[in-house]
């Protein structure tokens, strides 16, 4: 009701269920048409930047199962069935960012921001990729007015967060 004091924000929570291996899912539906061409290009760029990968991505396939929706990548060397858990995890996180971007673009007057919560963000990702992901999340948080919350046990990620706080503190002086 109007005046009840609650502010409504789109919210996405990425639980550890996102880490269930695709091979263990009973039923998988694939779709190559979920992303626009612009999103596909952005996904490829983000994927390789965050994972510090050089191999060109030939296609990106949306994978939907009972537990999750993610994006699998295929290259000239392997297809989406052989993606690492880190790639699968990253695909899910990027899809969440794209969901907020779609809301931002489709409802520019109504969209006020959103909340993205990620349980164990660092899971399945090596330290350098965790830091790259943090940089990308910071950029999207600013661009899309997102509050991003995550849990971690990664010392690399905690150090990167501390460095980021120090950098912001210096800018405010």
Model region roles, listed by residue range:
Residues 81-173:
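Switch/communication elements of ASCE P-loop NTPase nucleotide-binding domains
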Residues 2, 25, 38-42, 76, ...:
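Glutamate identity and glutamate-enriched acidic tracts
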Residues 12, 16-111:
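Extended helical coiled-coil dimerization/tether regions that scaffold
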